[in-house]
């Protein structure tokens, strides 16, 4: 769990982001640049809350759930509660972390699965990939680079 908190601590700050997404169905590519400010969410008084961060209107929170934790071959897995302003319902995400520089999220929304991997190349360069599948068929992929300023 310390590795996850360390990853979130390293993510705090202002970032310039460049994301490129490729949709396989129509072979269309788009790129988006944005600025992200990641800061801790101190508005929660939940005693089960381990860590919480906000990316603008999006927040990710790690809630203690000792029944859903697994430690296998140095890979720590647990469930993450994910909420945002558009959907008040919490989504449970399987989160895996192997060291303080690499974290993966696997989220299911009905027949759609999103696999995300984030890692630090250096302290001020964070990279990520996302694979979106519908009915186990890949429909889109994306790559993102973020530079801390």
Curated annotation (Swiss-Prot):
UniProt entry tagged with the keyword Plastid: yes
The entry's keywords: Chloroplast, Lyase, Plastid
Question: Where does it mainly reside?
Answer: plastid
Q: Does the keyword Plastid apply?
A: yes
Where it sits in the cell: the answer is: Plastid, Chloroplast
Q: Report the EC code(s) recorded for this entry.
A: 4.-.-.-
| Function comment | Might function to covalently attach a chromophore to Cys residue(s) of phycobiliproteins.
The record's family statement is: Belongs to the CpcS/CpeS biliprotein lyase family.
Name of the molecule in the record: Chromophore lyase CpcS/CpeS homolog
Q: What organism, scientifically named, is this protein from?
A: Porphyra purpurea
Q: Which gene encodes it?
A: cpcS
């Amino acid at each position: 769990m310390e590795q996850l908190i360390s990853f979130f601590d390293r993510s705090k700050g202002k970032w310039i982001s460049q994301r490129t997404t490729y949709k396989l169905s129509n072979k269309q590519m788009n790129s988006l640049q944005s600025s992200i400010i990641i800061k801790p969410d101190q508005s929660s008084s939940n005693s089960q809350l381990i860590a919480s961060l906000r990316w603008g209107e999006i927040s990710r929170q790690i809630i203690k759930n000792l029944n859903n934790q697994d430690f296998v071959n140095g890979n720590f897995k647990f469930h993450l509660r994910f909420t945002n302003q558009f959907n008040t319902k919490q989504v449970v995400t399987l989160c895996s972390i192997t060291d303080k520089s690499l974290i993966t999220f696997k989220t299911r929304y009905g027949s759609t699965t999103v696999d995300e991997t984030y890692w630090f190349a250096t302290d001020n360069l964070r990279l990520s990939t996302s694979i979106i599948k519908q009915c186990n068929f890949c429909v889109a992929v994306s790559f993102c680079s973020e530079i801390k300023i």
